[in-house]
């Protein structure tokens, strides 16, 4: 088996200021007026170059077609292509899954995507690209179902039209600490039980974030918010939008920008429902962030600490730490010129383990 080694180039520069590697020009993107539903405001992002992304396979597409297989570490026998060696069986691990991309297309994975099944439901911890016809690839994941370590299914799938909401994504992407993720899942489930009282008994009967989000009453509440943005996607196609900036209770918390309108479309339902879920579990009164603030948030991509990880010829992932925010950029190296596939930015200040929550998630 031809293993590709992930070469990590780590730069820790304190006191210096620089732009995130491969970040788009700050003047490229323009934020449009928001569409607001309750305490959730969505600011469309237009402008910037359009790249051909049709060749990128999403996790949903890959699992649905059977071209992508996800399994517990140590359960790969029979899944690897004939003639390929099988790595030693190290047994199932909470923070490790193994993925094989049998397709002819590169696979795009986004932080926050949830895979259900196996011994526990997991959330993917970081963006990455998996090359076509890959051998087994270790995935960095975090459990979002404390308390279960018994196989519910031999196969992994994804939650249909679901992605972990921003408040759950933050500890996985930034803290990278399992206990922090479990703590946030517990808090989120409690808040969701209050937001959807009929679902409270079922939510409290299980520790599963995925099951809670799939509860009919929770689906109804999340869907009622998300439905207000159904028509927005049609308008965004017309103007070639590539991303969105998100505000809850008047606080800007997140931005997602893609390489193409087509890619934004593919993730639209997942993203909108994740923001809607966060608006329900962070319900409070507040003003509305203005358009100028949303534009400023999107433009501030500089920081004083940067971590770069790269798989040569496949992708580069950059994390930039700024004053009150984190920027994550996934760059494709599989074609020339290289290009930014996905940019995610979150408002963030301090450590969740020290009791300081992400900006905009404070209660």
Regions found by a protein language model. Give the residues of each.
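Positively charged n-region of N-terminal signal peptides that target proteins for export
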Residues: 1-7
């Amino acid at each position: 088996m031809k293993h590709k080694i992930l070469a990590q180039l780590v730069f820790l520069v304190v006191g210096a200021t620089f732009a995130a590697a491969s970040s788009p020009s700050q003047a490229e993107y323009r934020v449009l007026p928001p569409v607001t539903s309750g305490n959730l405001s969505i600011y469309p992002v237009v402008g910037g170059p359009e790249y051909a992304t049709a060749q990128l396979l999403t996790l949903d597409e890959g699992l649905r077609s059977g071209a992508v297989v996800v399994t517990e570490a140590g359960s790969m026998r029979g899944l690897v292509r004939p003639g390929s060696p099988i790595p030693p069986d190290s047994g199932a691990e909470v923070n490790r899954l193994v993925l094989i991309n049998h397709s002819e297309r590169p696979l795009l994975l986004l932080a926050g995507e949830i895979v259900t099944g196996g011994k526990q439901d997991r959330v993917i911890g970081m963006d990455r690209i998996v090359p076509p016809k890959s051998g087994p690839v270790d995935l960095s994941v975090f459990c979002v179902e404390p308390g279960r370590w018994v196989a519910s299914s031999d196969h992994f799938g994804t939650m249909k039209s679901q992605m972990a909401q921003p408040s759950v994504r933050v500890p996985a992407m930034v803290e990278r600490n399992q206990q922090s993720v479990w703590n946030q899942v517990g808090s989120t489930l409690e808040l969701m039980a209050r937001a959807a009282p009929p679902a409270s008994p079922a939510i409290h009967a299980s520790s599963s974030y995925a099951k809670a989000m799939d509860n009919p009453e929770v689906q109804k509440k999340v869907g009622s918010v998300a439905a207000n943005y159904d028509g927005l996607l049609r308008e965004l196609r017309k103007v070639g939008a590539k991303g969105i900036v998100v505000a809850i209770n008047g606080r800007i918390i997140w931005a997602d920008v893609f390489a193409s309108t087509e890619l934004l479309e593919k993730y639209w339902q997942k993203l909108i429902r994740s923001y809607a879920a966060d608006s329900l579990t962070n319900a409070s009164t507040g003003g509305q962030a203005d358009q100028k603030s949303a534009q400023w948030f999107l433009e501030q991509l500089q920081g004083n600490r940067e971590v770069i990880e790269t798989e040569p010829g496949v992708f580069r992932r950059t994390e930039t730490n700024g004053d009150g925010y984190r920027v994550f950029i996934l760059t494709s190296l599989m074609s020339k010129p290289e290009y930014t596939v996905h940019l995610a930015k979150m408002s963030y200040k301090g450590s969740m383990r020290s009791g300081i929550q992400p900006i905009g998630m404070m209660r």
